[in-house]
Amino acid sequence: MPHATTSKPLTFYVDTPSVRVFQEFAGESLGKLDEYEAWDVITALCQAASLASQYEQATIDIHETIEALGDDIGFSDHCKKCLEALHGFPASQVNALMVGILAVAFDV
């Protein structure tokens, strides 16, 4: 019986509003994240949403987020490109985006 592997790439093939929003912001070439990168993106998005709420900003600031996280996360180059593409993403849509990423990551 085959077992699941953690190195399977995440492909954003599910057609949900949050996945469409992700693809719109991040572009087609950034539509794949491995599972570790997905968690890094979600961690950064949580921090970004928290900072946006704290400073009453309508959009997330990825540069401020990465600075706030410091060396806690060693972002891969692919992950950095993905996050950079999400700079300025509407803070009000971050939760939906994270749900979409999790839904694809865990095939729910």
Regions found by a protein language model. Name each.
Residues M1-V108:
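Short amphipathic alpha-helical interaction elements located at domain edges
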